[in-house]
Amino acid sequence: MLSAKKLFFTISLIFLVACEDRDYQDCNGIINGGAYYDDCGTCVGGRTGLTECIVDCNGQLGGTAYLNQCELCVEGNTNIPQDSCSNLNFNGYSYKTVIIGQQVWLAEDLKTDQFSDGSTIPDYNLEVIDSSGNKFVTNLNDSENRTFYYSAKTLNHINPIGWRIPTKSDVESLINELGGDSIAGGKLKEAGYNSWDFPNQFATNEVGFAALGKGYRNNSGNLVNAGRRYSFWTQDTLRVIDSIETYYWTLKLSFDSNNALLVPDSSGLGHPVRLIKDH
């Protein structure tokens, strides 16, 4: 007959064996812990504070490539810099794009003669004023290098899916990203004198926006301030007291200034259009 001491020892041994059958030590050294080895061979989960590795946008297990603001797979093993952008193809033209801060802009002005639905935008005609929305085009034979000036009536009817006319707030964010309205102008303007008159002050084009001194079309269709001014429309309006005319906010850059200013302009004028990518 087993003594009480031997019986206790036997029961304890059975209990210990039973516990050993149920317990285990995870890869982090924790009994019954929840850590495990992922596909990259790293101990994750449980109390490690680590999450398992995933396949990046370049197809690399545990890679560090990611989609940037232009939805382009960059960094990691791609050998593509983080600020790279793919071109936008629209209506037979390939547009350069550029990342500035958290925004993606066209790096050149819009050059379409069609509305978004595919219908043709009427050319401006001094003898037949078109109320449906005018497109003003400089008289150049080379379609690749023509300058397009759009009336405000065309806004929101000429942009491809995923892109839009910028808001006043979009432009304010752009200006702030570049240090404020007193120094942002030079960073946006094309350097040199191919399109700008002397002195084209402080122009560096350091962010790749490549604003050209195109001037604008006045209410009569005449080209004004070519070489001395660049501006583009926003979609936001300003109602002027005692005026029947609608004014739209525009970004204005000048040949003799480093400023980048938001100023209201008449909807009857013709300005270039610069698109921003939807968030």
Question: What would you call each of these model-derived segments?
Answer:
Residues 2-98, 138-139:
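Primarily marks secretory-pathway-exposed extracellular/lumenal segments that are disulfide-
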Residues 70-71, 76, 82-279:
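Conserved positions within compact, well-structured domain cores
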